[in-house]
Protein backbone atom coordinates (compact mmCIF):
# COMPACT_ATOMS: atom_id res chain seq x y z
CA UNK A 1 0.00 0.00 0.00
CA UNK A 2 1.18 3.49 -0.83
CA UNK A 3 1.51 6.30 1.73
CA UNK A 4 -0.95 8.65 0.00
CA UNK A 5 -4.67 8.05 -0.49
CA UNK A 6 -6.48 10.06 -3.16
CA UNK A 7 -10.22 10.45 -2.67
CA UNK A 8 -12.57 12.56 -4.76
CA UNK A 9 -16.17 13.54 -5.26
CA UNK A 10 -17.43 14.49 -8.70
CA UNK A 11 -20.58 15.65 -10.44
CA UNK A 12 -19.36 15.97 -14.02
CA UNK A 13 -16.21 13.82 -13.98
CA UNK A 14 -13.73 16.69 -14.00
CA UNK A 15 -12.60 16.12 -10.41
CA UNK A 16 -12.01 12.44 -11.24
CA UNK A 17 -9.87 13.49 -14.21
CA UNK A 18 -7.74 15.77 -12.02
CA UNK A 19 -7.40 13.03 -9.37
CA UNK A 20 -6.09 10.67 -12.04
CA UNK A 21 -3.61 13.30 -13.23
CA UNK A 22 -2.33 13.79 -9.68
CA UNK A 23 -2.02 10.02 -9.24
CA UNK A 24 0.02 9.77 -12.43
CA UNK A 25 2.43 12.44 -11.17
CA UNK A 26 2.81 10.82 -7.75
CA UNK A 27 3.40 7.35 -9.17
CA UNK A 28 4.02 4.66 -6.57
CA UNK A 29 3.65 7.13 -3.70
CA UNK A 30 -0.15 7.09 -4.09
CA UNK A 31 -2.80 4.45 -4.60
CA UNK A 32 -5.34 4.84 -7.41
CA UNK A 33 -8.01 7.51 -6.81
CA UNK A 34 -11.24 6.36 -5.18
CA UNK A 35 -14.69 7.95 -5.44
CA UNK A 36 -15.67 9.11 -1.97
CA UNK A 37 -19.12 7.54 -2.46
CA UNK A 38 -17.42 4.14 -2.23
CA UNK A 39 -15.30 4.98 0.82
CA UNK A 40 -15.47 4.05 4.50
CA UNK A 41 -13.75 5.61 7.49
CA UNK A 42 -11.37 2.64 7.53
CA UNK A 43 -10.31 3.51 3.97
CA UNK A 44 -9.27 6.99 5.13
CA UNK A 45 -7.54 5.70 8.25
CA UNK A 46 -5.32 3.40 6.17
CA UNK A 47 -3.23 6.34 4.93
CA UNK A 48 -0.94 8.75 6.76
CA UNK A 49 -1.53 11.33 3.98
CA UNK A 50 -4.85 12.10 2.27
CA UNK A 51 -5.56 14.14 -0.84
CA UNK A 52 -9.23 15.10 -1.11
CA UNK A 53 -10.75 16.47 -4.29
CA UNK A 54 -14.15 18.16 -4.23
CA UNK A 55 -16.21 19.58 -7.09
CA UNK A 56 -17.19 23.22 -7.20
CA UNK A 57 -20.32 24.87 -8.54
CA UNK A 58 -20.74 28.11 -10.44
CA UNK A 59 -17.84 30.43 -9.69
CA UNK A 60 -16.06 28.04 -7.36
CA UNK A 61 -18.67 27.68 -4.65
CA UNK A 62 -18.37 24.45 -2.69
UniProtKB/Swiss-Prot annotation:
Cofactor(s) this protein cannot do without: FMN
Keyword annotations from UniProtKB, A to Z: Electron transport, Flavoprotein, FMN, Nitrogen fixation, Transport
GO molecular function, one term: FMN binding
UniProt keyword Transport, yes or no: yes
Flavodoxin-like domain mapped to chain residues: 4-62
GO biological process, one term: nitrogen fixation
Function: Low-potential electron donor to a number of redox enzymes. NifF is the electron donor to nitrogenase.
Family statement: Belongs to the flavodoxin family.
Protein's name according to its UniProt entry: Flavodoxin
Phylogenetic lineage: Bacteria, Pseudomonadati, Pseudomonadota, Gammaproteobacteria, Enterobacterales
Amino acid sequence: MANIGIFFGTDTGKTRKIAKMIHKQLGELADAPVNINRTTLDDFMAYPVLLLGTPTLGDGQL
